[in-house]
Amino acid sequence: MRVSGSASSQDIISRINSKNINNNDSNEVKRIKDALCIESKERILYPQNLSRDNLKQMARYVNNTYVHYSGNCVLLSACLHYNIHHRQDILSSKNTASPTVGLDSAIVDKIIFGHELNQSYCLNSIDEVEKEILNRYDIKRESSFIISAENYIAPIIGECGHDFNAVVICEYDKKPYVQFIDSWKTSNILPSLQEIKKHFSSSREFYVRAYDEKHD
């Protein structure tokens, strides 16, 4: 875990290191901490209403890898979700050890957010994911989410899960819409709705989760 910055970074380290993780998961915790970077200088805050340019910049920041192929999409999406919540570039991820082996999202959640994030019921298409996100935005003004796709086929790795992000964008005088973000990618980080639907077939299973500070 690489750390730089002011005393505020020490607060994050203290919180991360104080999490009560099962001893059986110690190897997974080590992989996460070895890949996690904390950069908490007094950085400029992003605006409350994030733009596509803001999201692209934040997504590029969290991907701190040296080689593109790494099974760290769960950590990348958690880092981005954390940074979006705080409107700052704070966490990023390097390559994980055993790069073809993914990380357990429950353990990543506990380290980054302090608890496992509540997961939605199963959604069977990107259309359902979009509907769920907009519904939660309308009801509770939730605007940032982590999406887990099951049975995803990744290059080299084969069948696996894949985590990415979604944010509700509210542009002036326009209807709110969902922007998907895949910080694991090095190109097309902000795919359109049609591109993400083409990428994930309708037979996939999707789950939505989000950080709720009131949980703590």
Where does each model-flagged region fall?
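Active-site nucleophile-adjacent alpha helix/oxyanion-hole segment immediately C-terminal to the catalytic cysteine
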Residues: 2-116
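Conserved active-site-adjacent core of cysteine acyl-enzyme catalytic domains
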Residues: 83-161, 167-173, 178-183
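Short coil/turn linker and secondary-structure boundary residues
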Residues: 27, 50, 121-124, 191
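Large, modular interaction/toxin scaffolds in secreted and membrane-associated proteins
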Residues: 1-3, 186-187
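Active-site signature of cysteine proteases
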Residues: 159-216
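Surface-exposed beta-strand edges and flanking loops
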Residues: 5, 23, 34-36, 148-151, ...
